[in-house]
């Protein structure tokens, strides 16, 4: 490994230590539907967001609730502190398109129509309010 590559890898590794996130990949829900719920919780305190997700009637809210709990536990594990009410906030929610599974459905007159089953990736970043402002 070259010197410049090693230095940039060390910088990336160091910046990842101060980021607290959780990633969920290949969710069987389209990214468009995920963004509807992700927009509801972006920038909100984590325990309030858990309440919003718990009482949402969307399928994706179950996945996002588990993912948010995982992000909170990652923050607790990296910092060594317990998350208190009003301390931890969702800084960023990234929703990306994943693979598309293509199926064929029979159609009239011997034809076939494509059915596209869409998947998505979600990353949730959490941090304390005073670290967000710095």
Swiss-Prot record:
One of its GO terms (molecular function) is structural constituent of ribosome. One of its GO terms (cellular component) is cytosolic large ribosomal subunit. InterPro entries: Ribosomal_uL22 (IPR001063), Ribosomal_uL22_bac/chlpt-type (IPR005727), Ribosomal_uL22_bac/org-type (IPR047867), Ribosomal_uL22_sf (IPR036394). Keywords: Ribonucleoprotein, Ribosomal protein, RNA-binding, rRNA-binding. Gene3D superfamilies: Ribosomal protein L22/L17 (3.90.470.10). The keyword rRNA-binding applies. The keyword DNA damage does not apply. PANTHER family: CHLOROPLAST 50S RIBOSOMAL PROTEIN L22-RELATED, LARGE RIBOSOMAL SUBUNIT PROTEIN UL22M. This protein binds specifically to 23S rRNA; its binding is stimulated by other ribosomal proteins, e.g. L4, L17, and L20. It is important during the early stages of 50S assembly. It makes multiple contacts with different domains of the 23S rRNA in the assembled 50S subunit and ribosome. Part of the 50S ribosomal subunit. Belongs to the universal ribosomal protein uL22 family. NCBIfam families: rplV_bact. This is Large ribosomal subunit protein uL22. The lineage of its organism: Bacteria, Pseudomonadati, Bacteroidota, Bacteroidia, Bacteroidales.
């Amino acid at each position: 490994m070259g010197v410049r590559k090693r230095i940039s890898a060390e910088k990336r590794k160091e910046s990842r230590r101060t980021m607290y996130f959780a990633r969920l990949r290949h969710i069987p829900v389209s990214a468009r539907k995920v963004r509807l719920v992700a927009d509801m919780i972006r920038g909100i305190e984590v325990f309030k967001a858990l309440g919003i997700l718990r009482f949402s009637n969307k399928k994706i809210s179950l996945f996002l609730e588990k993912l948010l709990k995982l992000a909170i536990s990652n923050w607790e594990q990296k910092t060594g502190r317990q998350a208190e009410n009003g301390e931890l906030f969702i800084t960023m929610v990234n929703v990306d398109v994943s693979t598309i599974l293509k199926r064929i459905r029979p159609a009239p007159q011997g034809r076939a129509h494509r059915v596209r089953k869409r998947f998505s990736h979600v990353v949730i970043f959490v941090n304390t309010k005073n670290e967000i402002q710095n």
